[in-house]
Amino acid sequence: MTTGRCRVAVFASGRGSNFKALAERCQDPAFSCAVACLVTDDPAAPAITVARDFQIPVHVIDAGPRRGRLRPGAEADIVRHCRDEDVQLIVLAGFMRILEGDVLDAFTGRVMNIHPSLLPSFKGLSAQRQAFEYGVKIAGCTVHFVDASLDGGPIILQSAIAVHDNDDAEMLRERILVEEHRILARAADLFARGRLRIEERRVLGTED
């Protein structure tokens, strides 16, 4: 990858829509980030095809049988892969495993996640459907730094959209996804340019 650009590891378990959007953004040599590798817990994840299309290295980890929890030792394997790839930032983009120890210790303040709700509302799985079924008038997405809590780390960026009368849950999900792609690239760029700083729970440096 290009010298001087922030090397990003993207973690994904599924189709890799956010991964693909970020990889496309990184094709611009003027962009501050480059995707160093994909880390996935699923050897059949469609995100692997995306990585091959962009000639991005793939690391499939032996995560263990339980969805959510990683097997003992898996995080140490992840840290080793990331260090081998000279990773500076980790982006969780639909990674369906919980990071609890080694990764967060090794990359403190350098792990961010994209979540499809306006946190702190609607944490966890199927956040878009949660919001739709609750009847909110405003939905959206959040990029936040990752800590040991569930979707509870300091918020970097958020984007809000109106929920229309004719929306269904899938329509809302697709419109939120457009915003996910936009603010994830923006957050990675702000990190790469050294703009972000955390003061207690606030992330500063996000304004133009």
Regions found by a protein language model. Give the residues of each.
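One-carbon transfer enzymes
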Residues: 1-208
